[in-house]
Amino acid sequence: DFDASVDESFLPEIIRLCKENGIRLILVHERTLLFPSAAAEPKALQAYKRVLAEYLQANNIALLDFSYDPRLPEEYFTDVLHMNAAGKAAFTQLLAEALKPLMQSGQ
């Protein structure tokens, strides 16, 4: 439950410090194969991620979500959590492409 745990986490403090120091905070969900699709993800995790996204949006924090990105297929992983060299290269390119407009616009 995100709401029950957020105040016990460092996230509010990280956001506060970033805002105070003019730092643009961007959070990223990487793809894993642990839950290969949204349908495979437990309902509690889906709810947690949804409330987290709402919290970040309310605090003007960008969230880049690659959780189920089809451009990162199973062949790019050495196991359910870790990408192989090809996966790392592909993810780096995707991340750079996603970050570029955020950095240019200052959103």
Region spans (language model):
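Conserved, well-ordered alpha-helix/loop/beta-strand core segments that scaffold catalytic motifs
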Residues: D1-Y68
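Short coil/turn segments at secondary-structure junctions
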Residues: F2, T78-D79
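Histidine-centered active-site loop/cap adjacent to the catalytic His
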Residues: D79-Q107
